[in-house]
Design a protein with these regions (language model features):
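Generic detection of long, well-ordered alpha-helical segments
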Residues: 6-9, 108, 137, 141, ...
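Amphipathic alpha-helical segments that form well-ordered structural scaffolds
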Residues: 11, 15, 19, 117-121, ...
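Secondary-structure transition/hinge residues
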Residues: 20, 24, 122, 152-155, ...
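Secondary-structure transition/capping residues
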Residues: 23, 27, 98-99, 158, ...
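PAPS-dependent sulfotransferase catalytic domain
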Residues: 60-158, 171-182
């Protein structure tokens, strides 16, 4: 599993462990290790926003990536994404809360590169499954069934859901509805929203299933 911070990776992992306790996840302890779920694979390392994620590794193709993983390479790569606006507003709050260094680029450019790299890899393998966070919230059964089928796990008739997410505060119904109703859009002015759209790679967004930044 891979995804940028604030994309819903913890939520997905929690659901998987509840429903498939034997499922294992590739997630190294160090944030600059290729096995870490937030590892920055994109080639332009100058936009890495937080020093703990700094790395110089260049893995231009999926074969190079799996060669770096070696025997740790999993059977399936689940890539979790949030819609660009939802991700950006959450990421911006997170960067301020954790006192990240100021950057000279728009954060959405990292979104473009992170998911753009996985989009590129997806042209070279069938081992990658892209999952939208909102789909995970609205229809977790369908998502887990799809994952289970790809991993040859038994498909469950009904899944166990959760409000408690590892490494996160209690996930309330209000937070869920705010996300589904896109309440976060009110955090950006029209100027800020247009600035985001100007920097957003619409090809990457469309590939992930988001149109007009959604």
């Amino acid at each position: 599993m891979y995804g940028l911070q604030r994309s819903g990776t913890n939520y997905f992992e929690t659901l998987m462990h509840l429903n498939y306790p034997d499922a294992t996840f590739l997630n190294g302890d160090l944030r600059n290790e290729i096995t870490h779920k937030h590892f920055r694979l994109y080639p332009d390392k100058s936009i890495i926003p937080e020093p703990q994620f700094d790395n110089t590794l260049q893995v231009p193709d999926f074969a190079d990536f799996e060669q770096q993983l070696g025997t740790a390479a999993p059977d399936l790569y689940v890539i979790i994404s949030k819609d660009p606006i939802g991700w950006y507003t959450s990421y911006l709050r997170w960067s301020k809360k954790n006192n990240w260094p100021k950057v000279n680029h728009h954060y959405i450019e990292e979104y473009n590169m992170f998911y753009g790299m996985w989009m590129h890899y997806a042209t070279q393998t069938h081992k990658i499954l892209f999952v939208q966070y909102k789909t995970l919230l609205k229809n977790p059964d369908a998502v887990l069934q799809k994952v289970a089928a790809k991993l040859h796990y038994p498909v469950r008739d009904a899944i166990t859901n959760t409000r408690k997410v590892y490494a996160s505060k209690r996930f309330t119904d209000k937070k869920k509805q705010d996300t589904l109703n896109e309440a976060y859009r009110s955090e950006l002015s029209e100027v800020e929203l247009q600035d985001l759209y100007q920097h957003l790679n619409t090809e990457v967004a469309a590939f992930l299933g988001y149109t007009s930044g959604r």
